[in-house]
């Protein structure tokens, strides 16, 4: 799938994400009953790109691994990430970041890069799957589902229209999941 150079870049992003999210946990519990490391979320998003959407684009995998780094870490700044990975990847990460939170959905609506929308679809799918954890309130679940239907479904419908033909069936699967 990936050249040795691309593989090294992905490993670099993987370990930077792991480092940047060190000590952070999500509400979901792992098999031991402990909170899941936050890093597992970004890892699952990247894996969804590969396994579900069958995308083997190095820049997309790196952006998926680092998609929450700007808003949720102190060490992984846009400047550092641009120095390491370049402008294209950091542009995707910035579009996926809720910094600033105001105008986030509007920025995604104005985004004309199907790759960003594909990463967001995998991100949202992972977030929705984690709603099934014990202790998540019905109110929070309903809020997340409503937000997904109102704000994200239009983006995912656009993704289905704008993605390359060879990804269309898999993208439709993510949207319908």
Where do the language-model regions lie?
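Active-site helical microenvironments for divalent-metal-assisted chemistry
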Residues: 1-177
């Amino acid at each position: 799938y990936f050249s040795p150079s691309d593989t090294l870049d992905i490993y670099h992003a993987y370990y930077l994400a792991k480092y940047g999210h060190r000590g952070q946990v999500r509400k979901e519990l792992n098999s031991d009953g402990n909170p899941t490391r936050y890093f597992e979320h970004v890892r699952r998003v990247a894996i969804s790109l590969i396994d579900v959407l069958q995308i083997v684009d190095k820049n997309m995998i790196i952006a998926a691994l680092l998609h929450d780094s700007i808003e949720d870490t102190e060490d992984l700044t846009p400047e550092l990430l641009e120095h390491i990975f370049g402008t294209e990847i950091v542009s995707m990460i910035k579009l996926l970041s809720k910094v600033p939170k105001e105008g986030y959905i509007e920025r995604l609506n104005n985004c004309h890069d199907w790759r960003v929308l594909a990463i967001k679809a995998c991100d949202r799918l992972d977030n929705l799957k984690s709603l099934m954890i014990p202790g998540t309130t019905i109110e929070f679940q309903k809020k997340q589902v409503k937000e997904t239907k109102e704000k994200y479904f239009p983006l995912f419908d656009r993704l289905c229209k704008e993605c390359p033909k060879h990804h269309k069936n898999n993208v439709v699967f993510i949207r319908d999941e």
